[in-house]
Amino acid sequence: MLTTRLVDRFLDDSYSVETRRHVLPLTTARLTANACFRFAPPFLASISDDFGISLSRLGLALMITELAMGASPLLGSFVDRMHRRTAMTGGLLGISAAAVVAASSPNVWIFIVGILMISVAKFFFDIGLSAWVNDHVDYERRGRVIGITETSWALGLLVGVTVMGLVASQTSWRWGYAVGAGAVGLMALVIGARLDPHDVAGSVRDRNVVAAPMPRRGYLVFAAMFFLMASSQAMFVTFGSWLDDEFGYTEAGIAAVAFGLGAFELLASVTSARRTDAWGKERSAIAGAMLIIPAGVLLAVLHTQQVPGLVLLGLFLLGFEFAIVSLLPLAANLIPDAPGRGLGIVLAGGMLGRASMSVVATSTYDRFGIEIPALVGASMALGMILCLVIFSRDSRS
């Protein structure tokens, strides 16, 4: 079968049968979830116009949703006590319902409730998936499996957002969300039917283990995730408006750009899946961030040039994708006996980074254009590198 050949290219027989059997369906499910999660930023201009508000005001509303996700460490501990299948299928069903709320929202505040619900439900799915990988794969080889599942982030943009954007260009952004809701709901049924209902359950774990504290040096990874996600958010919430304002792109044109950017991200995901375990998690994450810095600076300089600007935007997001895929297995192993809690704490840092940058990037874009968000994104990547350098030194000492 085609799926078997695809798995064989990345995972040999040394990986468990359970891992090889389920990794592609889980990746597909996460693709649909990521498509719903990533749909709004490229089309913020259309959404803000529909609600009759400015881009910066919509950015402030998005900040509220990210700040509300500061409770993610608590959610991580909760997910650690759940069956993995329950966490993942419940998260997918929640995303589907939340996308319906966003699609039918009569005003911006109901829309924000829908976006917040997507974020919370996706967190349940992501933590459940990461914990499932931790249960089935040794840490030394975990980077490859996480790299495969993380291709869903790129494919969510390459395939999911592109399809939803094309639907939006012919109808409205609301129907884009409706399509996403249907796809996620379908994958919830698939995952619920495929996974073993008696798979590893966090509920049988010692509560003291689940509540294990984060090691002090783990907060350097928390800070690194803050800077990395802030860096990416600087571009994600502004590039659609930049294409519209600078070059007159329509929703269909933005969807086409999303397809191209997804290809860049997919290249980074596949490369990371193949190389991160060999190169080392910290070193690989730093390498990705080092690509962001020159791409952001040059984009600020060449933002009026369409082709160079698009290439630099692609390189910026390629660097981000390579870095995030490499950072996630490191984060999930900070508390080995409670991976959901450790990853939840680190992801809270990322959510705070996105929250702060949702306001900074949209407000500076409204005043100055894409130049300032691009430079801020580059500086955030530098902060991420410094955090991981210190973390790496502490690990060796």
Predicted segments with their positions:
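Extracytoplasmic gate region of multi-pass secondary transporters
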Residues: P41, Y219-F259
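Central cavity-lining transmembrane alpha-helices of secondary-active solute carriers
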Residues: M63-G76, F259-A268
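Conserved MFS/SLC helix-loop-helix module at the cytosolic interface between two early adjacent transmembrane helices
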Residues: A71-P106
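Helix-to-loop junctions at the C-terminal end of transmembrane segments
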Residues: S72-H83, A268-G280, Y365
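Cytoplasmic helix-loop-helix junction between adjacent transmembrane helices
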Residues: L116-T151
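Helix-loop-helix hairpin linking two adjacent transmembrane segments in secondary transporters
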Residues: T149-A193
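C-terminal transmembrane helical hairpin of 12-TM major facilitator-type secondary transporters
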Residues: E282-L327
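A late C-terminal transmembrane helix in Major Facilitator Superfamily
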Residues: D337-R367
